Amino acid sequence: MERSPIEAVLFDNDGTLVDSEAISNEVMVTTLGRHGIELGLEEAVTRWSGVDLHLMLRVLQEESGVTLPGDFLDEFRAGQLAELEARVEAMPGAAEALRRLELPRAVVSNAPVTKIALCLRTAELMEFIDERHLYSAYDVGKWKPDPASYLHAARSMGVAPERCAVVEDSVSGATCLDAADAVLDHRGELPDWPDVERLEALTDLLDRLD
């Protein structure tokens, strides 16, 4: 990587380490539908992937004219966690990449730490991650694309942000990284960004870090 030496790797979780996004989207679509807001699965992916959940719900309420109950997020989270615990799996290559990675690593997500940990345990990835290095946007009160959660993770690990490789899969995650002065490597069909390397599989990261 051009911005070497890299001293730590910060991974996004949903869609990067664990195949959780389709499950979460299904639960969100169903839960919104119970309260009169129609959201298609395709729109959930193309419009809202990686976006702050609070922002998404605020916009959907404004557009639909429907006011969601105060405990909506609790209802959604309960259904989401139950489905994830039953169904979530690791992304292809995630276990191998984490097993072979020789650098310190952390997981940084917009989701609560409880959800991050549940997904990693269910997908049998927690053995490769120190649970002290699970970082949530809820820790800092700012959500991607704001870089605050990545900066918080880097500081907590004692590593300068510019010496962290950041692995993301969403436009939202990519957008925040210039401000964080971190390197982004991502998987999936995303636009091209300067200084961003595209990964076809997580194991490709190991070659880039050599």
In which residue ranges do the predicted regions lie?
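Short, acidic loop-to-helix structural element flanking the phosphoryl-transfer center
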Residues: 5, 82-107, 113, 117, ...
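Helix-loop "lid/cap" segments that line or gate small-molecule binding pockets
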Residues: 29-32, 52-66, 119
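Short helix-capping segments at alpha-helix termini
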Residues: 34-38, 64-68, 124-128, 158-159
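Metal-dependent phosphoesterase signature
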Residues: 38, 58-96
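Asp-based, Mg2+/Mn2+-dependent phosphohydrolase catalytic module
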Residues: 1-7, 103, 112-210
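Active-site neighborhood of HAD-like aspartate-dependent phosphohydrolases
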Residues: 1-45, 63
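Short beta->alpha linker loops
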Residues: 23, 48-52, 76, 89-93, ...
